[in-house]
Amino acid sequence: NGKLCPKGYLGAYLLYDPDRFKGPMKRTNPKKGRNEVPKFVPVSWDEALNTVAARLQALRDKGESHRFALLYGRGWGASDAGLQGTFGRLYGTPNGSVGHSSTCADASKKAKRVLDGNYDYNAYDYANTNYMLIFGASFLEAFRPYNHNLQVWGHIRTKSPKTKVTAVDVHWNTTIAAADRALLIRPGTDGALALAIAHVIMTEGLWDRNFVGDFKDGVNRFKVGAATLKPEDFNEKWTKGLIEWWNVELKDRTPKWAEKITSIAERDIVVVARELATTKPAMVLFERGPT
């Protein structure tokens, strides 16, 4: 829309940020966990490089060089990526060049290619949604198209009715701070949360019958602890394999089960599931890697 992304203007803030790393940092607290402070302290480049070299040599001496992985982020040129891959082969690991795309949005493209043959990113009608459930998508930090997202955010958060936002992530960030509800989740457990949300929608009869279909007699048989359901008892419309999915995976994935895995309270999972199912139109965002 003829606007420039504000990231360029804000770049100076990164340069002069008092918390910006100016060199190597070493962790001094060996204990790890959500409530542990790592206690990083600055060290010299000589100490940092010698430490890394010693650990790499120790792995190779034990015949375990394959346990080393080298990950790099966005912005590396082709020559840099090639150098990293060569380093991995010389060292003796197949994990020597794990790039940004491997851990970010390319997973969504590959998933879409398997599902519908479209090897591209999703497009969303942000302007007309009334509910957004965001799974670690970094909507206000880096989600594409970033400039458009900032513009549409102002619209959806000031229109009537105001778009309600629930954000799921592993750390406090801009999107979490701006959302109506923040769910801080244990890393890598997004799937458990999604299953529990779906479980609530099915057991409470909140699914979209015009799109999904319904039981032939209109009686909801999605119940906790229910026996295996028969696919022929359900008139399925635009989805495929719902009953099989329930039988194999979904029937025991309660919010109580998910709470132990995700660290998100059972009551919060139930509330989000109900909001998502009853606020129309609604959308679920993901893409930039699992949280």
Where would I find each of the regions flagged by the language model?
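N-terminal export/assembly segments and adjacent metallocofactor-ligating motifs
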Residues: 1-207, 218, 257, 265-268
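Domain-level signature for respiratory redox metalloenzymes
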Residues: 183, 187-291
